[in-house]
């Protein structure tokens, strides 16, 4: 699957839960305090990510484009949008961010943290039911988070439908310090 094949009106999907690995990194860097159980889970997500390899072949048949989430959801979605010359609308309430991040109002970590190694893909609406069936497989979580649109903007709406302003887009390999 290519990054450059997202089509207008495709659904946008992600696998798994986002933000755990970024929490693990923040914990190891002593930037955050976490409850013991979450700390262990977060560090585990960073050090041994659970790759969704069991569904790659199935998704290849149902999807137009895909990328793994290594730089953060928004950064990696931006790679698809740029390569496909399209835009997107994302619903923040639908993004499967680690519940602790939502509870502590740290949702940006789940959107831009990186190292999740989950799959981000676009698929035609006609495949929605098939993808939902795949998501019922044991240990597979797939969530629809938005849609592809004409244009080049990426809009993230909050739970009230208002535009959400993200502080950091994600990891930049060429960022100068």
Where are these regions (language model features)?
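Helix-biased detector of long, well-ordered alpha-helical tracts
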Residues: 1-177
